[in-house]
Amino acid sequence: MSSLRRLLLLLLLVFPATLLLRVGPGGSLAVAQDLTEDEETVEDSIIEDEDDEAEVEEDEPTDLAEDKEEDDVSGEPEASPSADTTILFVKGEDFPANNIVKFLVGFTNKGTEDFIVESLDASFRYPQDYQFYIQNFTALPLNTVVPPQRQATFEYSFIPAEPMGGRPFGLVINLNYKDLNGNVFQDAVFNQTVTIIEREDGLDGETIFMYMFLAGLGLLVVVGLHQLLESRKRKRPIQKVEMGTSSQNDVDMSWIPQETLNQINKASPRRLPRKRAQKRSVGSDE
């Protein structure tokens, strides 16, 4: 029993000593080394982030420059400062659907070199987005040379589609020309939102069909009434009118007594006036 107690006391003394030796100065060094390694990794990550931000800041100006260059390359040609254009709509700025719209474009060369007017085109576009074409008309080839200090006039006409009536659209009219050096120019002579007017004059297909339908309906009504009247006339019974007897021979006189017949014959109106007339004539002679 005493030996067991001694062993337990020895273990109790040895075990804390071993723990102190393991976690002592060596353990603190390990923890310190771990902390320094973590700090180094954090500092390295911060430095890398700063380098990335610097690279992004350096790349931004180059990207903007590239975007500007792309815009310059992909952008449409502009008008030349040495040229001037005007437009005149022949029938005013009214655009009736399914009707001819005609306008004149004047070109003035104010420079010292010749300009070659190549073509004239027009198109209807979506009002909210002019990049979306609604109706694109055929370009008119011109190929006309305009000398310096000279003017030229060009005529163009188009027909708005009938379904576009009553709606607003963007009308774009472009005049394309170039100089002798090959520089291409484009002048937007007209670039505004216009409203297509619905045609009210004349007869369209729907109106003609409606009139024909009404005429046919009226004809059917007339024919029906005529047939109804004819059928009613046929159904009416013929009323018999009593005509009476035209002569006494048609009357059966056998049932009348003979004496009565003799009196009737004696007092007949045809014979009495004659007898009276004869008596009067005899009396006058006397």
UniProtKB/Swiss-Prot annotation:
Q: What segments bear the compositional bias annotation Basic residues? A: 268-279
Pfam families named among the record's database cross-references: TRAP_alpha
- Which residue stretches does the UniProt record annotate as biased composition, category Acidic residues? 37-75
- Which Gene Ontology cellular-component terms appear in the entry? endoplasmic reticulum; endoplasmic reticulum membrane
Task: List all topological domains (Lumenal).
Answer: 21-207
What are the glycosylated positions?
Answer: 136, 191
List residues, modification Phosphothreonine.
Answer: 260
- Its transmembrane ranges are 208-228
Cellular location(s): Endoplasmic reticulum membrane
Q: Which UniProt keywords apply?
A: Calcium, Endoplasmic reticulum, Glycoprotein, Membrane, Phosphoprotein, Signal, Transmembrane, Transmembrane helix
Q: Where is this region: Disordered?
A: 37-83, 261-286
Give the signal peptide as a residue range, or say none if absent. 1-20
> Per the record, what ranges lie on the membrane's Cytoplasmic side?
229-286
Entry comment on modification after translation: Phosphorylated in its cytoplasmic tail.
Annotated positions of the Phosphoserine modification:
247, 268
Membrane topology label:
Single-pass type I membrane protein
Q: Which InterPro entries match?
A: TRAP_alpha
* Similarity field: Belongs to the TRAP-alpha family.
Any further remarks? Seems to bind calcium.
The written remark on domains in the entry is: Shows a remarkable charge distribution with the N-terminus being highly negatively charged, and the cytoplasmic C-terminus positively charged.
Function as written in the Swiss-Prot or TrEMBL entry: TRAP proteins are part of a complex whose function is to bind calcium to the ER membrane and thereby regulate the retention of ER resident proteins. May be involved in the recycling of the translocation apparatus after completion of the translocation process or may function as a membrane-bound chaperone facilitating folding of translocated proteins.
Under which name does UniProt file this protein? Answer: Translocon-associated protein subunit alpha
